[in-house]
């Protein structure tokens, strides 16, 4: 779910950037999304959005699905999840968290005018 996803982000980036920095970034980080991603981090958000869309097509509820995960020194991972939907959603979130941690953060792409830049 979205709360767990925020913890996974913090785990993957070792607390270097607050989760709220990703809530209004580029064209895809945050609610909705359209156009071409503005950079690598925004592409991570689009991939995560697409993953959640795929989860929805499978009958899952990604924004509300609670799963078991662990935050280790090498980052987050999904723990012993047998239910397919929960595993799928957890994998979406873990992959995105690592993607966020690797991607550079460009302050100029935070809180952009999406009507102009995301067509």
Curated annotation (Swiss-Prot):
Residues the record marks as active site: 48, 93
Transmembrane helix is among the record's keywords: no
Tissue-level expression: Expressed by the venom gland.
Gene3D superfamilies: Phospholipase A2 domain
Residues at which Ca(2+) binds: 28, 30, 32, 49
Record text on subunit structure and interactions: Monomer.
Additional observations: Activity and lethal neurotoxicity are lost upon modification with p-bromophenacyl bromide.
Protein name as it appears in the record: Basic phospholipase A2 notexin
Taxonomic lineage: Eukaryota, Metazoa, Chordata, Craniata, Vertebrata
């Amino acid at each position: 779910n979205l709360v767990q996803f925020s913890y996974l982000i913090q785990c993957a980036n070792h607390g270097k950037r607050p989760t709220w920095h990703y809530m209004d970034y580029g064209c895809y980080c945050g609610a909705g999304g359209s156009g071409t991603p503005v950079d690598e981090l925004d592409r991570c958000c689009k991939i995560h959005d697409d993953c959640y869309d795929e989860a929805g097509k499978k009958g899952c509820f990604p924004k509300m699905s609670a799963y078991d995960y662990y935050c280790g020194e090498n980052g987050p991972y999904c723990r012993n999840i047998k239910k397919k939907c929960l595993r799928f959603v957890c994998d979406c979130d873990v992959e995105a968290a690592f993607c966020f941690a690797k991607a550079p953060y460009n302050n100029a792409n935070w809180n952009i005018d999406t009507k102009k830049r995301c067509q």
